[in-house]
C-alpha cells in the first residue's frame, strides 16, 4: 500500500511545499549544499544496482543497504532547509516514517528470499546510515547505461525545477 500512495502523495506534498515555503538566500544555499550530495548518491547508486538480477553490494551499496533512500532523505532534508518551514520538516519526517520505512522493510524481506547472500550482507551493512569502510569486494563498476535505464536523471530535473520555483518565490517576495 505504501508503495502505491508514494507518488500521488508526493505531488500533493509538492503543492503544499510550494505554498508553505519561505525561502531566503541563505536557506536556498544551505539546502542546496545538502541536497546536491543526495542527488549524487542517488545517481551513483542507480548506476550500480541491477534490480532483481543480482544482489548489489558495490559502490554505495558497500556502505549502506539503501543508498537510494538515503539519497532521497538527503534531498528531502535539503528541500526542508531551503523552504525554511518547520511544518515542511515535520511532514517530511512523517512521510518518510509512514511510507519509506515500510517499503524498505518489504524490499528487504523480498531480497532476503531472492538472494542467498543477503542475510550476511544485512548483518554487516547498515540499513540507512552508512558504515565507514566498504563491505566485501568491489567487483561491480558504475554503469552510466544503468543510470539512464533507471531514469535517475529525472531526479536532477525535478530538483532543478523545484529550486527554480523557490528562487522565483524568493525574488517575487523581494520585488513586491
Residue ranges of each PLM-predicted region?
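Membrane-anchoring alpha-helices and their flanking helix-loop junctions
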Residues: 1-61, 70-176
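Short, conserved phosphate/pyrophosphate- and ester-handling motifs at nucleotide-, phospho-/glycolipid
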Residues: 66
Amino acid at each position: 500500500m505504501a508503495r502505491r500512495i508514494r507518488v500521488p502523495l508526493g505531488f500533493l506534498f509538492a503543492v503544499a511545499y510550494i505554498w508553505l515555503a519561505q525561502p531566503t538566500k541563505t536557506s536556498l544555499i544551505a539546502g542546496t549544499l545538502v541536497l546536491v550530495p543526495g542527488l549524487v548518491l542517488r545517481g551513483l547508486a542507480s548506476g550500480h544496482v541491477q534490480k532483481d538480477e543480482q544482489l548489489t553490494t558495490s559502490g554505495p551499496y558497500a556502505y549502506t543497504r539503501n543508498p537510494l533512500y538515503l539519497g532521497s532523505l538527503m534531498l528531502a532534508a535539503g528541500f526542508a532547509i531551503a523552504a525554511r518551514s518547520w511544518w515542511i520538516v515535520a511532514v517530511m519526517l512523517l512521510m518518510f516514517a509512514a511510507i519509506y520505512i515500510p517499503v524498505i522493510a518489504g524490499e528487504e524481506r523480498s531480497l532476503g528470499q531472492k538472494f542467498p547472500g543477503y542475510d550476511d550482507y544485512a548483518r554487516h551493512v547498515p540499513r540507512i546510515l552508512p558504515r565507514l569502510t566498504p563491505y566485501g569486494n568491489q567487483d561491480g563498476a558504475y554503469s552510466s547505461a544503468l543510470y539512464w535505464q533507471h531514469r535517475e536523471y529525472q531526479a536532477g530535473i525535478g530538483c532543478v525545477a523545484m529550486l527554480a520555483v523557490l528562487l522565483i518565490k524568493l525574488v517575487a517576495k523581494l520585488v513586491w
